[in-house]
């Protein structure tokens, strides 16, 4: 079903659209738009959640949407727990995340400079080096928590292992997650089959957000569309397919920017009759 956008950037279905509205599929704009038909997330415990595919929040299309949430006074904590099992010790960890040598260091650290945040305001949680108390203090003393991309199931496993789930779920600052870091913010998420995960699966997340699911790195592939339909049918929730240049902001309601596909779950007539 095609979606249409009115002058206030509200998205409606083709049945509700007027002649002067633009079709969502033809609408090339990075301005935020909202889904009026999506109910507010129940049990929202955190002020703001940001769901992305990339850490590059200094790119113009992301910056223009996040700049009102991030200020130069903020303190950032980066939680890189999403590495795969081939990272076995601190030496391996340093090759990915340490200053001066980590391949993912600058793409998580330097991106905050555009918002006026300097290096002294950014800390990293080191899975292999920090004690649990040190990890908790770094998280609690921050106003922005960055959850990195990679393996969502392994990230949740490590969060539980280090007894961090409760303080992350109840985090009162801005939570930014990309790819795996976006997925685990949900109470329940799915993993579509790909080169890293051969089988479809449901996984439990942090439980910060509920009432919907996401398909990150969305390309509208056959496998992704099959996964989306499976989730809609089995879980009875709507799914957002987030293209590489798309993102979501959950701040009391759901606001989307860039390119997404909204797959709404609709109760079938048969099911509705059964309920009645």
Where in the sequence are the language-model features?
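Short, well-ordered alpha-helix to beta-strand connector turns
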Residues: 46, 73, 141-143, 171-172, ...
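The feature marks helicase ATPase cores and/or their adjacent C-terminal helical subdomains
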Residues: 1-46
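Flexible gly/pro-rich beta->alpha loop and the following alpha-helix that scaffold active-site loops
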Residues: 117-175
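Short helix-loop-beta junction
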Residues: 107-119
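Structural motif
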Residues: 6-7, 13-17, 35, 38, 51-56, 77, 144-148, ...
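Class I SAM-dependent methyltransferase SAM-binding "motif I" and its flanking Rossmann-like core
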Residues: 147-148, 154-158, 164-220
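C-terminal and late-domain segments of enzyme folds
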Residues: 47-72, 78-102, 189-276
